[in-house]
Amino acid sequence: MAGNSRRRGAVRKAGTKKGPTVGSGGQRRRGLEGRGPTPPAHLRPNHPAAKRAQSPPRRPAKRTEETETVLGRNPVLECLRAGVPATALYVALGTEADERLTESVSRAADSGISILEVPRADLDRMTGNHLHQGIALQVPPYIYAHPDDLLEAAAGSPPALLVALDNISDPRNLGAIVRSVAAFGGHGVLIPQRRSASVTAVAWRTSAGAAARIPVARATNLTRTLQDWADRGLRVIGLDAGGDTTLDDLDGSDPLVVVVGSEGKGLSRLVRQNCDEVVSIPMAGSAESLNASVAAGVVLAEISRQRRG
């Protein structure tokens, strides 16, 4: 259009007109004749996909436990009274002392735990701005035993008495069961590596110090470990309200593994299938079930009674 001829770039300069697109004249196509179909990307040496395929596989990240920090005057004091292993006690500068803080500092000093005074802002950062009341206790990760260590702990003594926990999720139940195992002559506790409560400061505190004496082991595959123990001569006894026998008929004289199911679902299907016997606890009245740690304590007490008799 004549009206647009003044627009910059509207009129092509002489000698700048593009010519027809020029191809290879079929040379590239003829050069590929007889070579077959194009190989997949991962088989072409210079293709990024081939380089990725030839590189060594990435190793999965190693799962490590994290240091735990206990916050607050009552929780910290309870941990120190229970002998929970700790590496450092942090106290915020300017914190008003009371009997709990004074006793915590005294117990930490007697136990050889480092006592560090830090600015309150630093303690806020360390604790993620959670309520700490001016005091925090650093607890290192628990060192778990190997399942074979539990068998070694039971060797050369009365018949083995071990407890396996099938996905117990409450650390207080774990701690209470560890305490019952210690009280009734058990040799160790086995937990799954995944989907299970860990030996945290809460579990340690609930065990009333028994976690220092009773080894807790982790199994990568709980069912497989129970099968291995059964092959080594241990009877696997599951606890369930719908058991095929009652506690009154249980013979506790053999080497035993007592398996306690999770708080809500009880024994998982595979674990139940690998039990030699499933035992229920007879109860009076309308009570339908017991807490997992209470049920474990009842059974362990009965086994201990039989072995004493």
From Swiss-Prot:
Q: Where do the annotations place S-adenosyl-L-methionine binding?
A: G261, I281, L290
Broadest EC class assigned to this enzyme: transferase
Does the keyword S-adenosyl-L-methionine feature in the UniProt annotation?
Answer: yes
Feature: compositional bias, Basic residues: 1-16
- Kindly list the cysteine pairs connected by disulfide bridges: none
SUPFAM superfamilies xrefs: alpha/beta knot, L30e-like
Organism lineage string: Bacteria, Bacillati, Actinomycetota, Actinomycetes, Mycobacteriales
Question: Which EC numbers does the record give?
Answer: 2.1.1.-
Of the GO CC terms on this record, one is:
cytosol
> Which residue stretches belong to region Disordered?
1-70
Q: Which residues form a coiled coil?
A: none
Q: Name one GO molecular function term.
A: RNA methyltransferase activity
Name of the protein in its database record: Uncharacterized tRNA/rRNA methyltransferase MAV_0574
Q: Name one GO biological process term.
A: RNA processing
Keyword S-adenosyl-L-methionine listed? The answer is yes
Q: Which Pfam families match?
A: SpoU_methylase, SpoU_sub_bind
The protein's matches in Gene3D superfamilies, at most eight in alphabetical order, are given as: 3.30.1330.30, 3.40.1280.10
* Family, as annotated: Belongs to the class IV-like SAM-binding methyltransferase superfamily. RNA methyltransferase TrmH family.
**UniProt keyword list:** Methyltransferase, S-adenosyl-L-methionine, Transferase
